[in-house]
């Protein structure tokens, strides 16, 4: 079964829009144990070092970028389930995205959509998709096809 405490989101910059903060709070309550860490934005090399240095040996790094692999919600849930008990860190870049170094270091690059979203919104969409993935795994009626 999927456990939110296995997931960590590393995101560059702060969420400044209150409606996104409110949305993230909803999903933090629905996903107890989900960790969201903000990394100070600035120089992309410093951001990269901060992301890479924070990954522990037992964690998989998943980089979110537009050229990454695309999943349906069902496929995303099944993919997470197939990872077993692995701890997963999702890295979300700032206004300049993620460096090539982070993308190359990642175990996988995924895309939330063919559309481009502001980095703040990407956090909210990812949190919702993690909740949806867990709901699918539980057989909850939250996800409808």
Swiss-Prot record:
Q: Which reaction does it catalyse?
A: pseudouridine(1915) in 23S rRNA + S-adenosyl-L-methionine = N(3)-methylpseudouridine(1915) in 23S rRNA + S-adenosyl-L-homocysteine + H(+)
One GO cellular-component annotation of the UniProt record comes to: cytoplasm
- Compartments where found: Cytoplasm
Record-annotated membrane-spanning stretches = none
EC code(s) of this entry? 2.1.1.177
Pfam families membership: SPOUT_MTase
An annotated Gene Ontology molecular function: rRNA (pseudouridine-N3-)-methyltransferase activity
Keywords from UniProt, A to Z, are: Cytoplasm, Methyltransferase, rRNA processing, S-adenosyl-L-methionine, Transferase
Residues that hold S-adenosyl-L-methionine according to the record = 64, 93, 112-117
InterPro entries listed in its UniProt record = Alpha/beta_knot_MTases, RlmH-like, tRNA_m1G_MTases_N
Top-level EC class, please?
transferase
Report the main location listed first in the record.
cytoplasm
Q: Does the keyword Methyltransferase apply?
A: yes
Report the sequence similarity comment from the record.
Belongs to the RNA methyltransferase RlmH family.
Role summary: Specifically methylates the pseudouridine at position 1915 (m3Psi1915) in 23S rRNA.
Q: How does it assemble?
A: Homodimer.
Official protein name in the record: Ribosomal RNA large subunit methyltransferase H
Q: Which organism is it from?
A: Prochlorococcus marinus (strain SARG / CCMP1375 / SS120)
Gene behind this chain?
Answer: rlmH
